[in-house]
């Protein structure tokens, strides 16, 4: 085996042994702990699959902002968590270099001290994140000013990647009919809807139709919010199962969802998703009580109305369909077994253990 700091060999297996090297961002403030496959006869990547997606990172030598490295490290930690989930779900993930048409890239930018703020958002595969979102005080002030119950780096990433996957997996496909049925007409003026959101209160009783007030802004935002919550659910349930956390032995008062709340209640796998959904409800009820016992905000400060449940089921059907494979795109899975988080538990396991 080569230098143990830089290269490893996979455990012996019938097939040829795969060699790996550390991501070079381990030695930077990103502190990346992912590995990179080494292929004989090919120039090796120096960055892992998550770090290769960065187009722009903060200036780590900026004397005016010596905290750039610390803030960047927090952002990269959240980004790795995002991509460990996406890879475990088998979703297509590639950089713009690897896939100039459908690839993903990130600009992690700090707002200039005397200029307009960097706006977090997505456009054609490019996700921009304001570096100051990694400053807890700044982010909490924004959360309070915008009257949001929840604002995290991971939440930002899951929301913005939702916009990417709408372009990538929904737009122009057979899924558009279901999208229009559940989320509405995305052709309405997006900029005008955003302006209206910041000038006016959300619709009356928005909580009966949306997972958040911001989701009521425009069908694209409704989609991205629901996508983020679907990833919250999948990752949290997976973590709970991986750690052996069970709720079936605890009496928890909650009203279970029934099949009629789903997008396709007659789907062959409808009961599987329903069990997953009710497992989520039990788990968040438990975790909210745990948070309150420490004087902390609720772990999951949201309520899922039936209309949102139908949207989540729609997203689940899309994610589990593999329909994008028909377009000739294989999901990028090279890093799945290298993630430090246990992401390989199946949904059926979650039903039997929670």
Range-by-range predicted roles:
Residues 167-221, 227-236:
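Post-HExxH zinc-binding segment in Zn-dependent metallohydrolases
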Residues 1-65:
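Cys/His-rich short segments
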Residues 137-157:
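Short pre-active-site segment immediately N-terminal to the catalytic Zn-binding motif
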Residues 20, 24, 66-136:
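Auxiliary, metal-adjacent structural segments of Zn-dependent hydrolase domains
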Residues 216-337, 354:
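Pan-zinc metallopeptidase signature
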Residues 129-140, 192-206, 261:
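Active-site-adjacent bridging/hinge elements
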Residues 335-353:
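Compositionally biased, intrinsically disordered low-complexity segments enriched
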């Amino acid at each position: 085996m080569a230098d143990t700091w830089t290269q490893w060999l996979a455990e012996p297996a019938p097939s040829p042994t795969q060699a790996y090297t550390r991501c070079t961002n381990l030695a930077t403030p990103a502190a990346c702990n992912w590995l990179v496959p080494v292929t004989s006869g090919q120039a090796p990547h120096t960055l892992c699959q998550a770090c290769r997606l960065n187009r722009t990172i903060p200036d780590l030598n900026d004397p005016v902002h010596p905290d750039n490295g610390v803030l960047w490290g927090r952002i990269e930690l959240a980004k790795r968590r995002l991509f460990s989930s996406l890879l475990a779900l088998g979703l297509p993930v590639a950089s713009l270099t690897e896939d100039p048409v459908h690839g993903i890239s990130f600009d992690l930018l700090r707002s200039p001290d005397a200029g307009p703020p960097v706006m977090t958002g997505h456009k054609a595969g490019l996700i921009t994140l304001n570096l100051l979102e990694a400053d807890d005080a700044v982010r909490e002030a924004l959360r309070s000013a915008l009257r949001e119950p929840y604002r995290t780096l991971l939440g930002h990433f899951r929301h913005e990647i939702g916009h990417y996957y709408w372009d990538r997996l929904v737009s122009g496909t057979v899924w558009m009919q279901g999208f229009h049925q559940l989320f509405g007409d995305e052709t309405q003026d997006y900029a005008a809807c955003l302006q209206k959101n910041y000038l006016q209160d959300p619709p009356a009783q928005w909580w009966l139709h949306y997972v958040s007030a911001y989701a009521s802004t425009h069908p694209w935002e409704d989609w991205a919010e629901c996508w983020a919550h679907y990833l919250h659910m999948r990752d949290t349930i997976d973590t709970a199962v991986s750690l052996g956390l069970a709720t079936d032995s605890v009496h928890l008062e909650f009203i279970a969802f029934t099949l009629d709340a789903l997008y396709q209640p007659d789907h062959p796998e409808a009961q599987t998703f329903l069990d997953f959904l009710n497992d989520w409800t039990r788990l968040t009820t438990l975790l909210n009580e745990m948070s309150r016992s420490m004087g902390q905000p609720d772990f999951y400060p949201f309520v899922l109305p039936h209309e949102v449940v139908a949207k989540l089921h729609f997203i689940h059907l899309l994610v589990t369909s593999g329909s994008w494979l028909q377009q000739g795109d294989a999901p990028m899975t090279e890093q799945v077994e290298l993630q430090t988080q246990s992401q390989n538990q199946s949904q059926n396991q979650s039903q039997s253990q929670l």
